[in-house]
Amino acid sequence: LFRSTAMVWDVVGPVCESGDWLGRERALAVRPGDLLAVLSAGAYCMSMASNYNTRGRAAEVLVDGAQATVIRQRESAADQMRLETLLP
């Protein structure tokens, strides 16, 4: 479904916390599959990241003009489990 006009959305984060708001009542002309850039991401940036609720840490992308470069890969479930030790 393509929307040529903006609709009002609440933009929330991926964890089950009542304070996980990234934007309230934002007018956005978006459609399924679109990506949103969240600037000044606070706790979503690597220096403040955690694995709360077993969420993998996000990739980081450096944007310079029209060029975007992934500078840190997204953390996978295997990355998280690598440091775990299973008891016999």
Q: Predicted segment positions?
A:
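Charged (often Lys/Glu-rich) extended helix/loop segments that serve as interaction or gating elements
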Residues: 2-88
